[in-house]
C-alpha cells in the first residue's frame, strides 16, 4: 500500500503566501494588543464624570489644548456647525425670554427678529448648520439692540446664557465666509457628550489616559465599563447650578442631583483605591449669581451669610461629607473655559495625588 493511503501527508502543513501573511498579521495584532494592554496598565487613568452641562467636556477639550497639539484646521472646522447651533440656541432663548417678560422691540429690531425666525423655519439640516453672513449680521443687530441687552442683563441667570454671550458678542466674526473656529471658540462651545471619549497624553513625564463619558442620565449606565483600574475620579460640579432645576427631572435641584451622583460614585467599592478630585466649576458664574440669588433660597439648611466664602465653604462641606478617606480627596474651584486656570489646577491635583501616594508608600515625608 502506498504511503499516501495510510501515511501522514505533509501537504496540509504548508501555508500559502496569503495564509503566511495573515498569520504574520495576526501575530502583529496580538503583539499590538498586548502592548496596548501593558501601556494602559502603566498609564495614570482618570475617569472624568459629572452631570450634563457641568463643564466636564470643556475640561476634556482643554487637556487636548494643553497636552497635545490642539486642533488642526480640519479638526477645528468640525466644530463650526456646533458653534453656529450654540448661537442660534442663545438668540432663540433670548427672543423667547423677551416674549415671556413682555419686553418689546423697536420696529426695525422686530423685523430682524422675524427674519431670524424665518431662517430657523427653513432649516433642513440642523446637524450641518451654517449661518449665512446676512443672517449673522441680522442676529448681531438683534443682540446689540437695547431691548435684547436689557433682557440679557436682567434675565441671564434664568436662561443660563453667560457662556453664549461670548459667541453673541462675536457673531459677525463667527459667520464670516472664511471663518475657522479658534481654540477659544472650541473651548467655549457647548456640546453634549454621548458615548465614551478617550485621550492619552504626557504631563511632567507621566503618561495619562483620560476617559470622558456622557453626563445625561441615559449615558450614566455606560460608566461601569470604564471602572477598571481607575487611579483618579475627576468629578465636575457646576457651582452655578445651585439654584437651577435638573432639566431631566424638574422635581430636583441640579446641584442636589449632582451631589447624589457624587455620593454614589465615591461609595462604589470599585473606587476604593482611587483618589477623588472634585472640581467646583463655573466658579466665576457662581460668584456673580450670588449677588441676585441667595444660596439660602435653594438650600434651607444653609444658615450663613450670602458672601462668596461662606457659600463656597458650605458647598465644599456638603460634598466632603460623602468622603471617608480624607487623605485621598482634593477639591478645587475652577473655570473650565480658562485654559490657564485648568492648567494650574490640574497640575496641582496631580501633584497632590502623587505626593499622597508616595507618603502612603513611606517614600515621602
Swiss-Prot record:
GTP binds at residues 50-57, 187-193, 212-216, 281-284, 336. Mg(2+) binds at residues 57, 193. Keywords: GTP-binding, Lipoprotein, Magnesium, Metal-binding, Myristate, Nucleotide-binding, Transducer. One of its GO terms (molecular function) is G-protein beta/gamma-subunit complex binding. Residues 45-58 are annotated as: G1 motif. Residues 208-217 are annotated as: G3 motif. Residues 277-284 are annotated as: G4 motif. Residues 42-364 form the G-alpha domain. Residues 185-193 are annotated as: G2 motif. Residues 334-339 are annotated as: G5 motif. Belongs to the G-alpha family. Guanine nucleotide-binding proteins (G proteins) are involved as modulators or transducers in various transmembrane signaling systems. G proteins are composed of 3 units; alpha, beta and gamma. The alpha chain contains the guanine nucleotide binding site. This is Guanine nucleotide-binding protein alpha-6 subunit. The gene is gpa-6.
Amino acid at each position: 500500500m502506498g504511503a499516501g493511503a495510510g501515511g501522514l501527508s505533509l501537504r496540509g502543513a504548508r501555508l500559502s503566501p496569503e495564509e503566511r501573511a495573515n498569520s504574520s498579521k495576526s501575530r502583529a495584532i496580538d503583539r499590538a494588543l498586548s502592548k496596548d494592554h501593558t501601556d494602559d496598565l502603566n498609564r495614570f487613568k482618570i475617569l472624568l464624570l459629572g452631570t450634563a452641562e457641568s463643564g466636564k467636556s470643556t475640561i476634556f477639550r482643554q487637556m487636548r489644548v494643553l497636552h497635545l497639539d490642539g486642533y488642526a484646521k480640519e479638526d477645528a472646522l468640525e466644530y463650526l456647525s456646533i458653534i453656529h447651533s450654540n448661537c442660534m440656541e442663545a438668540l432663540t432663548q433670548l427672543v423667547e425670554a423677551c416674549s415671556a417678560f413682555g419686553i418689546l422691540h423697536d420696529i426695525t429690531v422686530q423685523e430682524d427678529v422675524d427674519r431670524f425666525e424665518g431662517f430657523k423655519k427653513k432649516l433642513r439640516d440642523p446637524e450641518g448648520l451654517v449661518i449665512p453672513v446676512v443672517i449673522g449680521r441680522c442676529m448681531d443687530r438683534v443682540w446689540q439692540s437695547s431691548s435684547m441687552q436689557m433682557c440679557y442683563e436682567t434675565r441671564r441667570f434664568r436662561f443660563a446664557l453667560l457662556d453664549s454671550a461670548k459667541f453673541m458678542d462675536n457673531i459677525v466674526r463667527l459667520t464670516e465666509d472664511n471663518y475657522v473656529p479658534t481654540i477659544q471658540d472650541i473651548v467655549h462651545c457647548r456640546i453634549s457628550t454621548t458615548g465614551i471619549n478617550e485621550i492619552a497624553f504626557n504631563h511632567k513625564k507621566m503618561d495619562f489616559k483620560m476617559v470622558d463619558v456622557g453626563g445625561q442620565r441615559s449615558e450614566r449606565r455606560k460608566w461601569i465599563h470604564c471602572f477598571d483600574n481607575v487611579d483618579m475620579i475627576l468629578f465636575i460640579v457646576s457651582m452655578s447650578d445651585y439654584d437651577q432645576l435638573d432639566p431631566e427631572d424638574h422635581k430636583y435641584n441640579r446641584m442636589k442631583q449632582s451631589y447624589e451622583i457624587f455620593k454614589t460614585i465615591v461609595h462604589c467599592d470599585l473606587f476604593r483605591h482611587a483618589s477623588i478630585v472634585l472640581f467646583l466649576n463655573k466658579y466665576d458664574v457662581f460668584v456673580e449669581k450670588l449677588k441676585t440669588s441667595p444660596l439660602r433660597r435653594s438650600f434651607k439648611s444653609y444658615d450663613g451669610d450670602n458672601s462668596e466664602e461662606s457659600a463656597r465653604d458650605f458647598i465644599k462641606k456638603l460634598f466632603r461629607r460623602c468622603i471617608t478617606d480624607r487623605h485621598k480627596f482634593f477639591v478645587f474651584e475652577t473655570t473650565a473655559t480658562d485654559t490657564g486656570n485648568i492648567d494650574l489646577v490640574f497640575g496641582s491635583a496631580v501633584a497632590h495625588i502623587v505626593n499622597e501616594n508616595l507618603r502612603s508608600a513611606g517614600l515621602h515625608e
